[in-house]
Regions:
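Short beta-strand segments enriched in small/hydrophobic residues
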Residues: 30-32, 67-87, 130, 182, ...
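Flexible loop/hinge segments that line or gate small-molecule binding clefts
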Residues: 137-178, 279-291
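N-terminal helix-turn-helix DNA-binding module of bacterial transcription factors
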Residues: 1-73
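An alpha-beta-alpha
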Residues: 177-217, 321-334
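Flexible loop/turn connectors
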Residues: 238-335
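Hydrophobic alpha-helical segments within soluble ligand-binding/sensing domains
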Residues: 167-193, 230-238, 295-314
Length: 335
C-alpha cells in the first residue's frame, strides 16, 4: 500500500494517521472522516478512533485542520498528467468524456465540479467535499493529501489502498485471468502479456494478475511493455515473437493490427499464436477481424461510483466502498 499519506503529512518520528488506522483495524479514509467529523461513522467507531488517536499521541496537522471547514458542495476532478506528450490526443479525448460524465452526474446530485491540475495545492483540495482521480499515477500524492484533509476520494483499480473511499473495479484483474484461462484451455502452454508502461495503477494491477497466474502454473512470465502512443507496437510484438510464447494477451486494443503484424511474420493465428485483446467498448474492427476481446466499459465508471462518493460525503455510506463495473469476454477465431 502506498505510504504517501505518512510522508506528506507527518514529520519523521511523529505518530501518523496510518498508525491510528492500523491500531483500530480500519481504513485510513475512515480514520480521517472520524477525526474530521465527516461521513457516516458510528459513534462507537468514532469513539474508538478518537481514543486510539489520544492513546497513541496522534496530532493532526494544524495546517490541514485550519484548511478544512464546512461543506462546499464541490467535487474536484484531477486532471492527470499526460505520461507521454505525443499521446495527448487520445489521452485528452478519454479525459474529456470522463469529465463530461462527472459534471453531468455531479450536477444531478447537487454538486459543482472543480477541475484541478496535476499535484494541486493543498488549499485547493481542502475546499472540496470529494475528489475524483481517474487512472491515477503511482507517483501521485493528491490522494494522500486529500485523505489527510478528510476529503474522500474516488478512483479506480486501487483495491487494497485504505486511503481510497470509493474504488472502481473495472474488471482489469478478472479480464486478465479470464483471458489467460481461456488461452490455456485452448491449448496455449506459454501465454505472454503485451502491455503499457508501468506507472498507472490500472496497468500494474493487470500485470500483477498475469504474474500471479504464471506463478500458479509454474510458468516464466513473458512481458513486453510498449509506449502509450503505440509508436513501438510492432517492435514489442516482434519482441514477444522471438520468445517461446504461443499466445498473447494484449492490453492494447488494436487487436486487428496486432493480428496482421503476426501474420506478416509468416505465423498463423490461432494455429501458431493465439490472440486476445482488451478493449474499451465493443470494437467493430476487432470483431470483423475475428479477434477475441475482453471488453470493459469506461462509460460505466462514473454514475454509480460518483453516487457512492456522494453517499460517503453525506454520511449515508461508510467507506471503503467498491463499485464493480461490467465487462464481458467476446470470443472469436483468433483464440
Amino acid at each position: 500500500m502506498s505510504t504517501d499519506a505518512d510522508s506528506s503529512e507527518e514529520p519523521a518520528g511523529r505518530v501518523k494517521i496510518s498508525d491510528v488506522a492500523r491500531h483500530v483495524g480500519v481504513s485510513i479514509a475512515l480514520v480521517s472522516l472520524a477525526l474530521n467529523d465527516k461521513g457516516r461513522v458510528s459513534e462507537k467507531t468514532r469513539d474508538r478512533i478518537r481514543a486510539a488517536a489520544k492513546e497513541l499521541g496522534y496530532e493532526p496537522s494544524k495546517a490541514a485542520a485550519s484548511l478544512r471547514t464546512g461543506r462546499s458542495h464541490r467535487i474536484g476532478f484531477l486532471l492527470a498528467a499526460n505520461v507521454e506528450r505525443d499521446w495527448s490526443e487520445q489521452w485528452y479525448s478519454m479525459t474529456s468524456q470522463l469529465l463530461m460524465d462527472v459534471v453531468n452526474v455531479s450536477t444531478r446530485l447537487g454538486f459543482s465540479v472543480i477541475v484541478l491540475p496535476n499535484n494541486p495545492a493543498k488549499n485547493s483540495i481542502a475546499e472540496l467535499d470529494g475528489l475524483v482521480v481517474s487512472d491515477s499515477l503511482t507517483t501521485d500524492k493528491s490522494i494522500a493529501t486529500a485523505t489527510a484533509l478528510g476529503v474522500p476520494v474516488m478512483t479506480n483499480e486501487r483495491p487494497d489502498d485504505s486511503m481510497v473511499a470509493v474504488n472502481v473495479d473495472s474488471g482489469y484483474r478478472a479480464m486478465t485471468r479470464a483471458a489467460l484461462d481461456h488461452l490455456r484451455e485452448r491449448g496455449a502452454k506459454h501465454p505472454a502479456l503485451l502491455t503499457e508502461p508501468l506507472g498507472l495503477h490500472s496497468n500494474e494491477l493487470a500485470e500483477k494478475e498475469y504474474l500471479t497466474w504464471c506463478a500458479e502454473f509454474g510458468l516464466e512470465p513473458v512481458v513486453a511493455r510498449g509506449r502509450h502512443d503505440r509508436s513501438d507496437l510492432s517492435e514489442r510484438i516482434d519482441e514477444l515473437l522471438e520468445t517461446d510464447c504461443d499466445a498473447i494477451y494484449s492490453f492494447y486494443e488494436e487487436g486487428a493490427e496486432i493480428q496482421e503484424h503476426i501474420r506478416s511474420r509468416g505465423l498463423r493465428v490461432p494455429d501458431d499464436i493465439s490472440l486476445v485483446a482488451a478493449a474499451p467498448y465493443s470494437d467493430d474492427i476487432n470483431r470483423e477481424a475475428g479477434v477475441s476481446t475482453t471488453v470493459y466499459h469506461p462509460d460505466q465508471m462514473v454514475d454509480a461510483p460518483l453516487t457512492a462518493l456522494v453517499d460517503v460525503i453525506e454520511g449515508r455510506v461508510t467507506p471503503p466502498v467498491t463499485v464493480h463495473t461490467p465487462w464481458e469476454f467476446v470470443i472469436h477465431r483468433s483464440s
